[in-house]
Amino acid sequence: MEGRGFSGLYKNSSEELFLKTVMESPIGMPVPTMEMLGFKTVSQSFRTDSEELFKRWLTNDQEGYNSSSMGLNSRLSKRISTEIANMSNQQHIGVASEGRNNDKSCLQNNFLANDVSSDFNFPIRDPVDRELQSSNLFLAKAWFITDQRMTRSRSSELRRRYTEMQNSQAPQGLDSMFMVPEHDTNTIKEELANFNGFDYLSMCELPSQKGTFMSPSNSSSSTFNTHQLVDVDKVSSCVSMLKGTLQRKKLECQVEKEAAEDGLNEIFCIREPLFQSAFNEEESWNQQKLVNVQGDFTDQVNDPGVMQTLEGTTNFVLDGFANQTNQIQGRTASGEPSQSESSAAAPVISSGLDACEGPSNSNQTLGDSSWKQVGESTQNKVRGVREQIMDNLKDDRKRKSLERYGSVTSAVSDGKMDNTKKRRVERSRKMAEAKERNLTPTIPSDMQAILKRCENLEKEVRSLKLNLSFMNRKDSEQTKQIEDLQKQNEDLADEKERLLEEIERILSETGKI
C-alpha cells in the first residue's frame, strides 16, 4: 500500500524535483508546527474560557476554514511524506534523548506522520483533482453553514458539534509515539491539565478540524480521512470545560452578597450568632475565619461555683449598641474534659465575646451535650439583647414619624399630603382663632353679641355671593341658548321665504303651459 502511495506521488515532475532537493539537502525540512497543520487555535483554547472558545471556534474554524488553508495542508502533507517516512526513526531517537521542548515537537511530528500515513489507506488519484474536489466541497459546506440564519436550533447544533470536536478525534497511527519516554508524557499531561483548571485531554481527544465538516463514511472513493469518533463522557467534558466560568460566577455572586450585607449593616442589621456553618459529627468545627478580636480566656477551674459566676457576668445590657454591625458570638464554658488529657484533668472553661465579621477559623470540636448548652444559653441571652435593641429602634421610628403641627418635625409621605392638608389647614385656623381670642381683651356681653351677629352676617353674605355667581352662570348659559334659538328661527324664516318664492315660480310656469 505504501509503495503504491509513493509511486503516485512521483507522477508530477515538479513534485519529483522538490522531493529530490529535500532529500539531497543536508538540513532538510523543518519540523511542521501545529499552525502549518491548521491547528492554530488548539494551543490557545486551553487559556480562554468556554464562551471565548466557542466564539473563536465559530469565527476561525467554522467560517475561516477555507479552501486555501485546506489546499496548503494537503500539499504539505503530501510533499513532506517521503521525508518523514525516511527520517522518522532518526528523529524519534533524537527526541528521546532531548528535553521537554523536543518532546512537544516530537508529538507534533508524530501527529503529522499519522495524518500522512492515513492518506495512504485510499487509492491515490491525481493530486490536483483531489485538491480541487476537497476545496470545492469545503467551500460548499462553509457557504451552507454561514448562509444559514442563527436560530435556537442552529445554535444548539453548533454547540453540540463544538462539544463533539472537543471530546473526540480518531487516533490513527499513534503507534509511532511509543518512542517518547513515559515521564516526559506525564509531564506534558500535567502541563495541559494546569491550563485554566481544565482536565487533561490526551492527544486522542484533541479536536480534529477536518472531522467537523465531513461525515464518517466508509467508502473507498472518499477524498478525506474518515476519522473514527471516540466516545467520551459528554457530561464530564462539558463540566470540565465550564469549570472556570462557573467558579468566576460563584465568586461574583459571593462578592455581591457581601456588598449587600455590608450595605444592610450600615443601616442596621442584627444577625443570629454563628453556631452553624459546617458542623459535622465526624469532623471538627471547621471553616470559620476569625477576623477581628478574640477575647477568650481559658482557665482550669475546680470549683463549680465559678461556672455560675461566669454565666452571670455575661448577662450584660447593651443599651448603647443600637448601631452594632459586627456579629456577636458569646460562648459559655464547655464542662467536658479534653479527650487528649487524662480523666482526672479539670474541665476547661472558655467564655468571652468574639467580635467577628465572618466565620472564625477555629478547629474546635464540640460534643452534642456541650453544643446544646452553648447554643441554648447564648441564644437566650442574645435574644434578650436583640429584643431590647429592637424596642429602642421602634421608639426612634415612632419619634421620627411624628407630623409637624407648629414646632414638631414632619415625616409624612407624599401620598398622605392630600388627605392631611385639609385637616392641617383647619386645625391651624382654629389655633389662630383661639390665639386671637386669648390675645384680645375682655369685651362686654352686648359687644360680643354684636360681633357674633356680624360674623353670621358675613357668612350669609358669603353664601349669597356664591348663589349669585351660580345664578349668573346659569343666566349666561340660558342667554346663550336663547341666542342660539333666535338664530335658528331666523334661518327657518329665510328658508320659508325661499320656499314660497319657489312655489310661486312653479305655479306661474304651470299657468303658462
Swiss-Prot record:
Its main location: nucleus. Disruption phenotype: No visible phenotype under normal growth conditions, but roots of mutant plants are impaired in the interaction with both rhizobia and the arbuscular mycorrhiza (AM) fungus Glomus intraradices. Stunted growth when grown in nitrogen-limiting conditions and in presence of Sinorhizobium meliloti. It comes from the Eukaryota. One of its GO terms (biological process) is nodulation. Residues 333-347 have a biased composition (Low complexity). It is found in: Nucleus. The keyword Lipid biosynthesis does not apply. The keyword Cytoplasm does not apply. Residues 447-513 form a coiled coil. Keywords: Coiled coil, Nodulation, Nucleus. Highly expressed in roots. Expressed in root hairs and nodules. Not detected in leaves or flowers. GO terms for molecular function: protein homodimerization activity; sequence-specific DNA binding. Residues 329-380, 395-435 are annotated as: Disordered. InterPro entries: CYCLOPS. GO terms for cellular component: nucleus. A motif (Nuclear localization signal) lies at residues 397-400, 421-424. Residues 359-380 have a biased composition (Polar residues). Belongs to the CYCLOPS family. Involved symbiotic signaling. Required for root infection by symbiotic rhizobia, infection thread (IT) formation, and nodule development. Required for proper induction of early nodulin gene expression. Probably not involved in nodule organogenesis. Involved in arbuscular mycorrhizal (AM) symbiosis. Required for fungal infection of the outer cortical cell layers, and for arbuscule development during the AM symbiosis. Acts downstream of CCAMK. Required for symbiosome formation (i.e. the release of the bacteria from the ITs) and subsequent symbiosome development. Forms homodimers. Interacts with CCAMK. This is Protein CYCLOPS.
